Amino acid sequence: GPIQISYNYNYGPCGRYCGILGVSPGDNLDCGNQR
């Protein structure tokens, strides 16, 4: 599930897309599930 957007924004593989879309580009998983 979704976690802190800031955490994913800085460290997530989806990068800035996490902060904007809340999802990784080309993925259906939300940023909270991306590491």
Swiss-Prot record:
<keyword id="KW-0146">Chitin degradation</keyword>
<keyword id="KW-0378">Hydrolase</keyword>
<dbReference type="GO" id="GO:0006952">
    <property type="term" value="P:defense response"/>
</dbReference>
<keyword id="KW-0326">Glycosidase</keyword>
<keyword id="KW-0119">Carbohydrate metabolism</keyword>
<dbReference type="InterPro" id="IPR023346">
    <property type="entry name" value="Lysozyme-like_dom_sf"/>
</dbReference>
<dbReference type="GO" id="GO:0008843">
    <property type="term" value="F:endochitinase activity"/>
</dbReference>
<comment type="similarity">
    <text>Belongs to the glycosyl hydrolase 19 family. Chitinase class I subfamily.</text>
</comment>
<protein>
    <recommendedName>
        <fullName>Endochitinase 2</fullName>
        <ecNumber>3.2.1.14</ecNumber>
    </recommendedName>
</protein>
<dbReference type="GO" id="GO:0000272">
    <property type="term" value="P:polysaccharide catabolic process"/>
</dbReference>
<keyword id="KW-0611">Plant defense</keyword>
<keyword id="KW-0624">Polysaccharide degradation</keyword>
<dbReference type="GO" id="GO:0006032">
    <property type="term" value="P:chitin catabolic process"/>
</dbReference>
<keyword id="KW-0379">Hydroxylation</keyword>
<comment type="function">
    <text>Defense against chitin-containing fungal pathogens.</text>
</comment>
